[in-house]
A protein has these predicted regions:
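Non-catalytic structural scaffold of enzyme domains
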Residues: 1-174
Length: 174
């Protein structure tokens, strides 16, 4: 997972991957990672002469679905620190209350296979405990997090809609 890594290292790794892809004469690159999208997309688009497409930050979906005008944004530490989800949401509705929550171990839990178990539920309650009942939308700001969507749904009950940005399309700008 890239979330705990410094932005410079994330950019370096991503450039190495793109350089490798260019050896195969690719015509475009889709960044299927929120951390890379929010931290590196403009630099990558400037460096490479092919289309570089990032993840959608789901601001329009939140705007349409949130009746309380209150949303939790779950992401890696690097994704939350970049502030791009918050910026995108405030660009759509300045009255929206957003709770950016860095979920330090979600990606590692998923990679270790802790889905639907007590460790997953413990982590979900740790990160979402303070906003349960406050928010009516939860944005999954990392491509690992949909694996924990059922755990999040169980914890939040029917009080919140889960938005998986994989289904919101892609974005040219973070």
């Amino acid at each position: 997972p890239y979330g705990p890594r410094p932005v410079e290292e994330i950019l370096l790794f991503t450039e190495q991957m793109i350089d490798r892809l260019l050896e195969s004469d690719v015509k475009a690159v889709v960044l299927a990672c929120n951390t890379i999208t929010v931290n590196c997309l403009p630099a990558l688009q400037q460096k490479y002469m092919i289309p570089i497409i990032g993840m959608n930050l789901a601001a329009e979906a939140v705007n349409q679905l949130s009746e309380k005008r209150s949303v939790a944004i779950l992401g890696t530490a690097a994704t939350i620190a970049a502030g791009k989800h918050l910026e995108a949401l405030q660009g759509v509705d300045t009255d929206l209350r957003a709770y950016p929550i860095p979920c330090y171990d979600f990606a590692a839990l998923v990679e270790a296979g802790h889905i639907g178990d007590s460790q997953a539920m413990s982590a979900v309650s740790q990160y979402l405990g303070d906003v349960r009942g406050e928010v009516d939308v939860v944005v999954l700001g990392c491509t690992h997090y949909p694996f924990l969507a059922k755990d999040i749904e169980v914890f939040m009950g029917d009080t919140a809609t889960i938005i998986d940005p994989r289904y919101c399309g892609s974005s040219q700008k973070p």
